[in-house]
């Protein structure tokens, strides 16, 4: 069979996580924090999400096919640190996040504020934004396995402080 063409490679990252964690967006209201071109949003739609709030600090990045879908609420020029359930039209049942140039640990309180009490969160941890600039190697890569693990633990601890329970961790494909 032929491989589906997605709007971005981000789609493969979310597919891997949803499958690894057995999380289904079907029938759920979702928040895609850091939507960019919409790879995560496209997967959520493909897997039956009822509605997706696609939030990003950028402007004009979301693919037209997603922007024009009635199930997608586009929130551009939006700092996800300032999101609230009220700002996005009510709480969501699933939060997915693929953020750059910001620590996920600092954004988790806002993502939590947007989530219903029964929500799931599937965040993409990027070590280069969690460990501090002084610990990031050439090209913005954190290659030390201990530092990478520390980044995941930092985010997991912050999530636990906010009432989340880490189910599992998986590497991005």
Descriptions of predicted regions:
Residues 118-132:
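Conserved beta-strand signature within the Rossmann-like core of class I S-adenosyl-L-methionine
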Residues 43-51, 164-173:
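Conserved S-adenosyl-L-methionine
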Residues 36, 40-41, 58:
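Residues at the N-terminus of the alpha-helix immediately C-terminal to the conserved SAM/SAH-binding loop
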Residues 105-122:
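A short glycine-rich, Lys/Arg-flanked "PGG" loop and its adjoining helix->strand segment in the class I
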Residues 50-106:
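S-adenosyl-L-methionine
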Residues 1-23:
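S4-like RNA-binding module at protein N-termini
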Residues 26-36, 44:
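Conserved class I S-adenosyl-L-methionine
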